[in-house]
């Protein structure tokens, strides 16, 4: 229910990546492949050398903050008995693929989306300060 407004508002704070940028390449690969675990996406983008992981993670973080990529699921490695173990690997995709294009492009301005979310926060958290609401919407 709240994703369209969240996405609309966040994308207004984080503009679409510039043409030819690494962020745009990441989005293009995800659009072509559908969804990939982080490790596969990193390799597909050529970030395979030493110290490349943290640089790549910074690009992913910016795209996630802007609502351009989301975690669809977590994939767990299997042991020799076929049982899941360890930490899950994030399966990344675009929200357009996961929720549909309409859910990412509502028929209202980013400011209207912000106001809707602010009203909801004020309803469910009535005793919080304006500073808290601002932090939640940041």
Predicted regions and their residues:
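Long, low-complexity intrinsically disordered regions
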Residues: 1-138
């Amino acid at each position: 229910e709240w994703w369209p407004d969240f996405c609309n508002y966040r994308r207004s704070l984080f503009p679409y990546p510039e043409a030819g940028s690494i962020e745009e390449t990441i989005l293009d690969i995800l659009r072509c492949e559908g969804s990939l675990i982080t490790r596969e996406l990193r390799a597909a983008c050529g970030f395979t050398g030493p110290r490349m992981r943290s640089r790549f993670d910074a690009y992913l973080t910016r795209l996630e903050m802007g609502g351009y990529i989301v975690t669809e699921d977590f994939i767990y490695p299997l042991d020799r008995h076929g049982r899941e173990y360890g930490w899950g690997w994030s399966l990344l995709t675009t929200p357009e693929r996961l929720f549909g294009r309409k859910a990412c492009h509502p028929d209202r301005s980013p400011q209207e989306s912000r106001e809707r979310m602010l009203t909801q926060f004020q309803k469910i958290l009535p005793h919080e300060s304006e500073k808290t609401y601002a932090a939640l919407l940041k």
